[in-house]
C-alpha cells in the first residue's frame, strides 16, 4: 500500500515538474533552447529504444544520432535528417558485421518522431506545439477516464487494458479541445482545426499502442526509469511522437495547398 502511494505521489510530482519545464521552454520560445533540450530528451529516448529493439549500444549509433541532430538545426527540413540518419545506419550495417539489421530501427522510432517534433516547432512555432500537447493530453486523459467509466470492449490484443470506448472518448475530447487551440491562422479556421485535431488524436492512439506492443514483446513494463512514477521518456512521449509527424504533415500540405490556390488565383 505504501509503495503504491509513493508511486502515485512521485507520478504527480514528476508530472507537475514536467508541465513547469515545458511551460518555461515554450514561453522562452527560443529555437536553440528548444533544439538543445529536445536533443537531450531524444538521446535518452534513443537509449530506451535500443533496449526495446534489443540493439547493443555502440559509438557509431550515437555518432550518427549526434551528427543528424546537429544537421537538423541548420536544415530547413529536419525530418529529412532523420531519414538520412537511417540510410547512413543502413550503410554501416551493410559495411560492418558488428551490427544487426535491427540497429536501424531506433532511427525510425523514436527518431523520425523527434525530428518531426522539432520540425513542428521550427516551421510552425510554439503555438503548434501547444496545439499538439492539448490534443495528445486530452486524448490520453479521455481514453483513461472514458475506459474506466464506460470501457467494455478490448481495443486490441497488443494492449488488452485499453478499451474501444475509452479510445473513442479520448479522440472526441481531443478533437473538440484541439479545435479551439488550433483554430487561428495556423489551420485556417475552426472546422479545419477540428478535422486536423481528429486526425492527430487518431494517429496518437497508435503511437501509444506501438509502444505498448514493443514493451510486451520484450517483457518489460516501462521503457525506462528516468521519470519517477511515469517510467521512461518513450512512456510519456509515444503518442506525442506519432502525433508530431501527423501534425507536421498536415500543416505542411495545408501550406502547399494555400500556395497553390494563390498561384492559380493569380
Curated annotation (Swiss-Prot):
Its EC number is 2.7.7.41. It is found in: Cell inner membrane. It catalyses: a 1,2-diacyl-sn-glycero-3-phosphate + CTP + H(+) = a CDP-1,2-diacyl-sn-glycerol + diphosphate. The chain crosses the membrane at residues 16-36, 52-72, 78-98, 101-121, 125-145, 164-184, 186-206, 237-257. It is a multi-pass membrane protein. Pathway: Phospholipid metabolism; CDP-diacylglycerol biosynthesis; CDP-diacylglycerol from sn-glycerol 3-phosphate: step 3/3. InterPro entries: PC_trans. GO terms for biological process: CDP-diacylglycerol biosynthetic process. Keywords: Cell inner membrane, Cell membrane, Lipid biosynthesis, Lipid metabolism, Membrane, Nucleotidyltransferase, Phospholipid biosynthesis, Phospholipid metabolism, Transferase, Transmembrane, Transmembrane helix. Its main location: membrane. GO terms for molecular function: phosphatidate cytidylyltransferase activity. GO terms for cellular component: plasma membrane. Belongs to the CDS family. PANTHER family: PHOSPHATIDATE CYTIDYLYLTRANSFERASE 4, CHLOROPLASTIC (PTHR47101:SF1), PHOSPHATIDATE CYTIDYLYLTRANSFERASE 5, CHLOROPLASTIC (PTHR47101). This is Phosphatidate cytidylyltransferase. It comes from Helicobacter pylori (strain ATCC 700392 / 26695) (Campylobacter pylori).
Amino acid at each position: 500500500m505504501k509503495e503504491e502511494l509513493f508511486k502515485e505521489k512521485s507520478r504527480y510530482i514528476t508530472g507537475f515538474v514536467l508541465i513547469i519545464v515545458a511551460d518555461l521552454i515554450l514561453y522562452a520560445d527560443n529555437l536553440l533552447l528548444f533544439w538543445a533540450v529536445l536533443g537531450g530528451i531524444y538521446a535518452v529516448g534513443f537509449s530506451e529504444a535500443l533496449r526495446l529493439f534489443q540493439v547493443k549500444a555502440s559509438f557509431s549509433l550515437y555518432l550518427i544520432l549526434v551528427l543528424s541532430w546537429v544537421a537538423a538545426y541548420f536544415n530547413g527540413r529536419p525530418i529529412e535528417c532523420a531519414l538520412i540518419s537511417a540510410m547512413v545506419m543502413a550503410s554501416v550495417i551493410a559495411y560492418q558485421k558488428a551490427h544487426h539489421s535491427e540497429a536501424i530501427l531506433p532511427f525510425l522510432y523514436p527518431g523520425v518522431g523527434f525530428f518531426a517534433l522539432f520540425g513542428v516547432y521550427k516551421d510552425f512555432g510554439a503555438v503548434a506545439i501547444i496545439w499538439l500537447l492539448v490534443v495528445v493530453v486530452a486524448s490520453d486523459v479521455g481514453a483513461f477516464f472514458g475506459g474506466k467509466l464506460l470501457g467494455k470492449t478490448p481495443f486490441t490484443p497488443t494492449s488488452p487494458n485499453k478499451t474501444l470506448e475509452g479510445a473513442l472518448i479520448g479522440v472526441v475530447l481531443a478533437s473538440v479541445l484541439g479545435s479551439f487551440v488550433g483554430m487561428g491562422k495556423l489551420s485556417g479556421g475552426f472546422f479545419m482545426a477540428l478535422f486536423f485535431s481528429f486526425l492527430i488524436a487518431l494517429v496518437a492512439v497508435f503511437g501509444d499502442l506501438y509502444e505498448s506492443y514493443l514493451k510486451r514483446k520484450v517483457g518489460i513494463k516501462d521503457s525506462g526509469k528516468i521519470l519517477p512514477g511515469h517510467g521512461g521518456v518513450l512512456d510519456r512521449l509515444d503518442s506525442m511522437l506519432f502525433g508530431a509527424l501527423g501534425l507536421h504533415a498536415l500543416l505542411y500540405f495545408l501550406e502547399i495547398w494555400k500556395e497553390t490556390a494563390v498561384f492559380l488565383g493569380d
